[in-house]
């Protein structure tokens, strides 16, 4: 949007990086100096940097700021922040809400947090001029629950450059096709317990790499570590070159989730030309079509079967790899997605 000449401002929570200050990238360091990232203005808002309060406080202050600034459109992402969507709406702003998933269903949220997030969902259904959803399943949910029409505009992905294994070899002893990769947040709904239980029954000399940071779920991460065998590597949060190397050199990428919005990591994995194995939830199968393997959600035995099948059939893995990148980059093109979003911004407000 910025390249097309639009003035875009992002309001981001203050405080440290979710995985620690050491994970601030060089790009983010430059953004702190200039206030811009690739032509987009970035502003941090006052935030109570405490477990359970960061998202609530930052979305509240963002809503107040955007309500009183001279913006044509206020675009809110996720159900929790949508709790405040009525504020900019009352002051004449056109309000768009993107629903990334039914976040109140996530296992990590307790009573108040789940109520707050679901109330945000209801506020979006009532007050937003337009609602964007990332999956057909969520689109149907909004129609069935609220009688509210939404617009399906999925995430996009760009074709990356694959890179050779270097850092992952130095740090973890990993080589090309030497491991199965999971990359995402370490939270219960991602199906990681099923994955580890299935992996413990697999016959292979490959490693299982679980890459990603916990999100207020440190106790869950420790439980997984205790259940995992010696062939499982936990990297913690990763980014930059290390991230690209893990995607570029995996034998299989797997996403065993019980619950998703639209899994951006799955798009990224396919854009790197990975053979993917996902659970059969609609949010995953709609993305991959017949260009990946799937197993029955929550079924450890079926997950183990498909993992072993792919580990024992390198020709099948090669076939999936050869078609993945072309398929996904055509299907989820960022340029087309930006134009669809801009068209939505131009629609008249809802009264």
Task: Go through each PLM region and give its residues.
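Short alpha-helical donor nucleotide-sugar binding micro-motif in glycosyltransferases
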Residues: 237-238, 245-250
